[in-house]
């Protein structure tokens, strides 16, 4: 259909592709997929190297550029993201005898906390049973919800009483 035969059609009529033919599967998949954030890429590369190993600034720039960021246009954004991560304490500059002066590593406390959080999330997912579509909430959740409602009803009609005798003059 896409090829035009010279003898069959006039020069004035052109073949216009329909919407389904114009959008290929690769176009649709690239639109739906989004790039990860720069901070996520930086933290991921540092986490892959573990706590003891350090990563140079050039390696981080390469990792960010591989994910699809144009580093010639986004150097200011890269610097800003690095500075924010340093201010938050998620990463730190290496000042001891390890690596170059521009090398960075993941903060030990943050790395340990993230490992504990990941383990807790996995434990919760294992312990939770998937609910059926028509199933009601579990009993502990219902108790919490009902207690919240009762507290709201208790305090709904209560008026505030003035503290002490502010308005009374002796």
UniProtKB/Swiss-Prot annotation:
Entry superkingdom: Eukaryota
InterPro entries named in the record: Histone_H1/H5_H15 (IPR005818), WH-like_DNA-bd_sf (IPR036388), WH_DNA-bd_sf (IPR036390)
Tissues and organs where the protein is expressed, per its UniProt entry: Expressed exclusively in the testis by haploid germ cells (at protein level).
A Gene Ontology cellular-component term: nucleosome
A molecular function GO annotation: DNA binding
Keywords noted in UniProt: Chromatin regulator, Chromosome, Developmental protein, Differentiation, DNA-binding, Nucleus, Phosphoprotein, Spermatogenesis, Transcription, Transcription regulation
Residue numbers bearing the Phosphoserine modification: 56
Family: Belongs to the histone H1/H5 family.
Stated role: DNA-binding protein that may be implicated in chromatin remodeling and/or transcriptional regulation during spermiogenesis, the process of spermatid maturation into spermatozoa.
Protein name: Histone H1.9
Organism of derivation: Mus musculus (Mouse)
